[in-house]
């Protein structure tokens, strides 16, 4: 798998030699792994670029979360919001009281003030909205999954690829979080040893059903419960964890086997399984075991990456490393605090600025993890959109209309972009997740074909 955001190859020696003191400390057994620098919280910090005029389409629970997060980011200026359901539109206005409110998405796209559009509707509606927004010359942030079919996702990705003046970002938020980038560097450096296997889960005891006094409206808002409109648990939720594993391993899966059952929520005529398991096969014999359920909440969600020298557990953007007894010693144990993890004892990072100068003044081990992935993702999108818009404006003022030259110029500009999931990453994630869902529904094994990932 060729990853455009791939880091330079790092040897174990290079990684250890170039790491900060806090990073070296984090490589001890059972250590919370933290990003090397404490980020400035976007809500309280200075804008990293000029404000971008934003329009949000889709004001359900997640759309309102995006809206609320944007309202705290200095780079965002919310000028338009849209939802076809009046009560949702009114709730959205609480976070954006000055924004133009409409029930017609075309009004948002025709609004010349709007520079960037956020698509937060159900996935089966994404294609029409995202493609139209790109054709209107807008920057587009489209939630994950890109679509509920591979055909629709491919159409969106192809439109994004063709719209070279626009920034397109898929809502795989973890790809923008600095903690994840630290783990990416750590795993690819070989410090974990040889990758052996991975495990991930998402458990929530909830029905996924929303109530409404209107029967038609109730059917509309419960799109997750019908196979016609739902990508299932693995496509709606699991896509983020599957993408993380694929990203960290820098390999697409070779095959997937799945199983799914409707066990708990059997009385409302849904046909989407509430409990699923999937095994994804990667090169070199590495397997990811994934499970998700709406019937039990125990242990919530996490990922574990197993290597020949250590295992890494990731929860809530925090991570801990558990070393094998025969793993190489790093020599910093004297500075570390020991924590208990059930029957195991790990060595914890001491958050002490007097000893760990790399933590920075007032820094803590949780400083990066305290900011959610959505904030980092939206800030990356806005920063990249502002940078590209400025580059286009400056180029045209100096060189006029020359699309080929402009395309080359923007390719250089994008080399310094903030980390985020683009159209290819978003499309690849959809192919993996939707094929996994197909395997789950059919209780079968599916081999991935190279051409499924091709955008032409």
Show the residue positions of the predicted features.
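Predominantly a Rossmann-like dinucleotide-binding segment in NAD(P)-dependent oxidoreductases
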Residues: 58-62, 162-169, 173-270, 300-304, ...
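Beta-strand-loop-alpha-helix segment that lines the small-molecule cofactor/substrate pocket
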Residues: 116, 122-123, 127-175, 190, ...
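N-terminal secretory signal peptides and thylakoid transit peptides that target proteins
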Residues: 2-23
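Active-site beta-strand termini and strand-to-loop segments that position acidic
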Residues: 279-284, 307
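A structured beta-alpha segment of the ubiquitous adenosine-cofactor-binding alpha/beta core
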Residues: 100-115, 119
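C-terminal helical cap and adjacent loop that interface with cofactors, partners, or active-site loops
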Residues: 17-27, 39, 65, 240-246, ...
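N-terminal Rossmann-like dinucleotide-binding module
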Residues: 18, 22-96, 245
